[in-house]
């Protein structure tokens, strides 16, 4: 009986040690990752683009920058909440820098358009970079200068203080690779098919390629 009790205690202790190691590893990993928030028009598109980037761990669609708490997609689309459609990007700074991510971002949008993006019009589709500190602000300002110098046009993408980020509902997460069948203006399609049809019809890639040429990232054909 004593031997069995000792063995059980040893097993429990071993499991506890493993759990502690796993927890410490998880905390250390979380401490090594960083997040950033950008608004680039349709959040499905921005999420889709950045989840392809090496060093990006995840991209989450949501809303930020407004005055309405816990906004819904329908509320934000009215333009009365002050919120932007935005994406929160979690990344590993050892694999990709904040500066590189911002450069990819600015070259994946039309920063000269202050009224929305591509076929999506209205305040919720405006573009912005949300910064958390002086370093991020300086890098964002340098990115805007780069865009202005490259495009030789006035840049309408805003640099704003980071605000609370509200995660959009499940139907809006990973829409670009969803398998659920939905009714759209293109008929009944799988979400992934509806996304591709929408992106093409909206002219996002054509406009970005026209602006940025060979430097344009994320172009799909």
What are these regions (language model features)?
Residues 2, 9-22:
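Bacterial N-terminal signal peptides
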Residues 2, 27-221:
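Flexible coil/turn and secondary-structure edge motifs
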């Amino acid at each position: 009986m004593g031997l069995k009790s000792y063995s059980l205690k040893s097993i429990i202790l071993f499991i506890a040690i493993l759990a502690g190691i796993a927890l410490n590893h998880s905390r250390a990993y979380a401490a090594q990752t960083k997040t950033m928030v950008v608004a680039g028009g349709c959040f499905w598109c921005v999420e889709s683009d950045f989840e392809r980037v090496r060093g990006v761990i995840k991209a989450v669609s949501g809303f930020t920058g407004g005055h309405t708490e816990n906004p819904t997609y329908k509320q934000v689309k009215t333009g009365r909440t002050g919120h932007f459609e935005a994406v929160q990007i979690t990344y590993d700074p050892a694999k990709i820098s904040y500066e590189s991510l911002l450069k990819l971002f600015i070259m994946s949008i039309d920063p000269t358009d202050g009224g929305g993006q591509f076929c999506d019009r209205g305040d919720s589709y405006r573009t912005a970079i949300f910064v958390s500190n002086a370093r991020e602000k300086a890098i964002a300002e340098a990115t805007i200068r780069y865009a202005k110098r490259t495009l030789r046009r006035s840049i309408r993408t805003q640099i704003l203080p980071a605000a609370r980020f509200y995660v959009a509902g499940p139907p809006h997460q990973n829409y670009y690779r969803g398998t659920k069948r939905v009714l759209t203006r293109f008929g009944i399609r799988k979400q992934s098919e509806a996304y591709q049809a929408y992106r093409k019809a909206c002219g996002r890639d054509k406009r970005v390629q026209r602006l940025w040429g060979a430097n344009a990232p994320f172009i799909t054909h």
